[in-house]
Every structure is written in structure tokens, then in C-alpha cells.
């Protein structure tokens, strides 16, 4: 059977369901596919198909994630749903499933619970741009005042983590009613209302191509009579012959001009996000550039050594450490293409971090790295991955 061609006639957006265990994330995911299947925007995927998500390995970490896709009148969506709480933590920290927005599912019968908080905090720390709330299981709550109370509680919780709690759309409904074709006003209609809110409220992500040029340097060559060539895969933006670029990280930032772009040994006039290229740099010596630096549009990114991070520490079974670590732990932090040693400081009240924990921590690197908030990294000991993290806030 021929593979269906992926039609790219609508803007694409990546979203996911987050929230406390048993509040109905997977039922909601199934309900969205069921309701949108009526108009041909999805293939109905039943609860048990989503629930037995296959295991994937991202950066050496095992994560179970279910992927479904669907479309509304406005957009094409890739939607991720994880069976277990630990899978969410790993997914959000490693960025294995990039989220342009999230649907926070809260059971109206229980209100916000510990993992509701933790997922909102993670969404804030890893930079999920926007959330929409589905207040699920409203068929189990008879008292409308109670519903209003839960809604208020959710809004306050969102605001306490710097999300615009007063403005975030909260849709009340029942995923189960939608799946069982009961009470359309809280079933099918609520799902359609939710998708309208997702369409309208979650901003369309900027395509990598439209962002300022950045290429992590993987290798450096000297070509006699022509100069120095750096190679790598363009992460974002585009580069043209004649563009001025900065070399950022590890040493003092320097400026140069791209005098040639080649791909597969052919000369091009430009390279764009996703391309593996070689860039010829004017007047740059072979020893001025090294793997681990980046080539970037001038002024678009700066080098830093100190930042706050959110990290997940692998279990022994995942190939991680067998023992806890403490403040002043000194592993290597692997950013893009290179390892840099750094010192970890744990927050007040955290004595130690056990394998399998996720933790907020401060890091100080021994050499500066070009970074933005949201940049992912691996934590390594002698080339072995023992954790994964994301830059939450740059301090210096």
C-alpha cells in the first residue's frame, strides 16, 4: 500500500495533553479524534490504542509517548499524550515532543492535584508558550457553584506560575460523554469548543526558517588557498553568501563574513534550516574556530556561563547513576555539539538528588556557551549520559 502523501496546505502546530493522572488526558485525546473524524479531520483512535503507547528512546532516555494527528478548519496538529507521569516529565525536559501549546486537563470532580501543579510548573520552566484548559468530568458534578470554584482555583494556580490565568480559555465538558455519544452539550459540542479555543488561543509557532540564523559548528577544515570552512546543520534561519556572522561561545565573540556555502560538494548561494552545509569564512584562521561554537546572525545570541535549569536524572535502569549527587556536583553539560564542565548548586531544602528525580538547579559552566532560554542539554559523566535538562533562566 502506498504511503499517503502528507499534504502541507495548513499551518502545522504541535500540542499535547498534560495534567494529573486519571483526570482524563487520554480519554480527551481519543474524544478529539472521534469528534474531528466526523468532518474527516482525523482518524478515530480509541483509548486503548493511545494508552499502550510504544516506548521511544530520546537522548538515551526511554519515554512512552502516543502520537495522534488531526486537523481543524484552520490548522494541522500533531498531538502527544503520555501514559505515565514520569513520561511527561522526561518528555517536557528533553523536548522529545516539542510543544507549541498544551491542553491542561483537570477533573472537575477533584480539582487541581499535585501533578496538575507539577505539569504547569514544567510547562513554565521549559517554555511552553500557551495553555488552554479542559475541565473534564463535569457530568460527575451536580453543583454549578462547585464548578465555578474549581475554575477559579485553576485560574489562580495558572497565575501563580506566571501564566495569564484570567485570560486562559477554560472549556467545561466530558470526554467520556463525547466518546459515548451522550449529552452533546458537554460531550461533542464541548470538544468542538475546545478545538476552537486551541485554534484561536495557541499562537502559531514561528517556523525555524523565519528565525535568526544559527548553526552549531561540528567540524573545522582548512582549505589551502581558500581559507577556513566550518560544517554543521543549520538549526534555524538561513545564510547567504556575503552575510556577516558572529562566532559565539567558548572564546570572545568574533565577526566574519561567509564567502561561500556548499552542500554535497556543490556551491550554493544560500543554506536554510535543516541543511547540512559547509561555510567558508573570510579571514578566519583554522585555530580561531572550534566545535561547540555557533555561527549566528550578529546580535541574535550571546554566550553565558550561569543559568537556572530544570533537569531529569536517569535511573540506574536507564543507564544513569547508581548513587545520588549533592551540591557542587561537577559533571559535563553537553550543548549542541560539545561538552563543558559545570558546577551544580541545588535549591534550598534539597539535600541531594536521586536517580529518577527531576530537579530545579543552578549551573555555572567553566566556559561560556551560546544559549537561549529553552535550550536543551544532556548531563554526562565521561561520555555517558546521566541526565537531561533545559535552560529555564539565564543569569549571567
Curated annotation (Swiss-Prot):
PROSITE patterns registered for this protein in UniProt: G_TR_1 (PS00301), G_TR_2 (PS51722)
**Region of interest (G5), ranges:** 174-176
User: Any one cellular component term from GO for this entry?
Assistant: cytosol
Q: Chief location of this protein?
A: cytoplasm
Region named G1: 19-26
Q: Which reactions is this enzyme annotated as catalysing?
A: GTP + H2O = GDP + phosphate + H(+)
Indicate where this protein resides in the cell.
Cytoplasm
Instruction: Region G4: list its residue ranges.
Output: 136-139
Which positions fall inside the tr-type G domain? 10-206
Would the keyword DNA-binding turn up in this protein's UniProt record? no
Q: Which positions are annotated as binding Mg(2+)? A: 26
The ranges of region (G2) come to: 60-64
Arranged from A to Z, the UniProt key words for this protein are: Cytoplasm, Elongation factor, GTP-binding, Hydrolase, Magnesium, Metal-binding, Nucleotide-binding, Protein biosynthesis
Describe the task this protein carries out: GTP hydrolase that promotes the GTP-dependent binding of aminoacyl-tRNA to the A-site of ribosomes during protein biosynthesis.
**What family is this protein classified in?**
Belongs to the TRAFAC class translation factor GTPase superfamily. Classic translation factor GTPase family. EF-Tu/EF-1A subfamily.
Instruction: Report the HAMAP family cross-referenced here.
Output: EF_Tu_B (MF_00118_B)
Quaternary structure and interacting proteins, as annotated: Monomer.
* Stated name of the protein: Elongation factor Tu
Amino acid at each position: 500500500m502506498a504511503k499517503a502523501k502528507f499534504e502541507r496546505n495548513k499551518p502545522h502546530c504541535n500540542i499535547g495533553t498534560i495534567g494529573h493522572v486519571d483526570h482524563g488526558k487520554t480519554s480527551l485525546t481519543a474524544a478529539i479524534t472521534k469528534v474531528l473524524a466526523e468532518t474527516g479531520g482525523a482518524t478515530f483512535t480509541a483509548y486503548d490504542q493511545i494508552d499502550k503507547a510504544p516506548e521511544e528512546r530520546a537522548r538515551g532516555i526511554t519515554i512512552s509517548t502516543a502520537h495522534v494527528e488531526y486537523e481543524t478548519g484552520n490548522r494541522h496538529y500533531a498531538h502527544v499524550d503520555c501514559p505515565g507521569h514520569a513520561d511527561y516529565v522526561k518528555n517536557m525536559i528533553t523536548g522529545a515532543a516539542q510543544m507549541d501549546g498544551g491542553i491542561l486537563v483537570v477533573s472537575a470532580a477533584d480539582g487541581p492535584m499535585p501533578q496538575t501543579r507539577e505539569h504547569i510548573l514544567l510547562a513554565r520552566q521549559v517554555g511552553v508558550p500557551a495553555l488552554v484548559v479542559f475541565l473534564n468530568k463535569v457530568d460527575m458534578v451536580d453543583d454549578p457553584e462547585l464548578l465555578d470554584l474549581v475554575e477559579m482555583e485553576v485560574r489562580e494556580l495558572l497565575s501563580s506560575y506566571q501564566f495569564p490565568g484570567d485570560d486562559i480559555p477554560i472549556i467545561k465538558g466530558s470526554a467520556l460523554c463525547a466518546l459515548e455519544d451522550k449529552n452533546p452539550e458537554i460531550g461533542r459540542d464541548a470538544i468542538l469548543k475546545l478545538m476552537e479555543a486551541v485554534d484561536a488561543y495557541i499562537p502559531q509557532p514561528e517556523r525555524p526558517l523565519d528565525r535568526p540564523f544559527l548553526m552549531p559548528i561540528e567540524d573545522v577544515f582548512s582549505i589551502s588557498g581558500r581559507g577556513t570552512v566550518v560544517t554543521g546543520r543549520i538549526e534555524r534561519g538561513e545564510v547567504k553568501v556575503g552575510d556577516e556572522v558572529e562566532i559565539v561561545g567558548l572564546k570572545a565573540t568574533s565577526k566574519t563574513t561567509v564567502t561561500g556555502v556548499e552542500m554535497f560538494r556543490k556551491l550554493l548561494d544560500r543554506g536554510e534550516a535543516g541543511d547540512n552545509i559547509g561555510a567558508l569564512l573570510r579571514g578566519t584562521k583554522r585555530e580561531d574556530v572550534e566545535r561547540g561554537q555557533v555561527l549566528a546572525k550578529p546580535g541574535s545570541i550571546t554566550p553565558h556561563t550561569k543559568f537556572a535549569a530544570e533537569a531529569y536524572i536517569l535511573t540506574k535502569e536507564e543507564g544513569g547513576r547508581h548513587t545520588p549527587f549533592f551540591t557542587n556536583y561537577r559533571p559535563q553539560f553537553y550543548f549542541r555539539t560539545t561538552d563543558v564542565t559545570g558546577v551544580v548548586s541545588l535549591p534550598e531544602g534539597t539535600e541531594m538528588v536521586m536517580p529518577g528525580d527531576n530537579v530545579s538547579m543552578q549551573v555555572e559552566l567553566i566556559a561560556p556557551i551560546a544559549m537561549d532560554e529553552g535550550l536543551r542539554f544532556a548531563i554526562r559523566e565521561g561520555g555517558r549520559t546521566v541526565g537531561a535538562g533545559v535552560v529555564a533562566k539565564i543569569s549571567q
